Amino acid sequence: MKFNRYPIISSGAEHLVMGYLMRRNILTFKAPPNHQGYDLICIHPGAKENGAHLRIQVKSRLATDSPLAFPVRKESLDAFDYLVLVLLNVGNFYGRAKQNPAPRGACTPTIFTFPQSFVKRHFDGSSSWKKVCLHQLRLDRYRDDRGIERIARRLKIEYPTPASCVVGYRDFELQHTAPSAKPVRIRKPR
């Protein structure tokens, strides 16, 4: 079977994940190229507060009608903390391609964020194509922002709030102080 390789699109999946992570205030860096096991490194934006880091492996599927499965090397199962699957949904390439060819089958990308324990539990090493099958699994808690939130919680990153907003009492306002970025209540002048 012949496989198409699209390195720009694969790199785009990594950058898409970086964008989602940074949107949630998670400081994210690309790992060195061809680094086995993980593609991104995530740390707390206030590294002095929390020196923890997480290793993220990014897998992508190009076709909208691709099966919900992805290959993973057994040797790399311990090399990452989270695996992010990006369904790029570029268009139909398989069975539906005859009735609805690419790009007509294109739609918005979907992101799933799986912890290492989930990947290990659903890893199928018995087939020649070592993979994780997601068919018939309930995946809502790992999807899009809910999945990204798992990484933020693990790094103990609070949800971003406005720099100054009224919190219900007329005499207090919520302000962020640099560099800790933790909310502090300050009495408003009258």
Stretches with model-predicted labels:
Residues 1-36, 41-190:
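Mixed-charge (Asp/Glu-Lys/Arg
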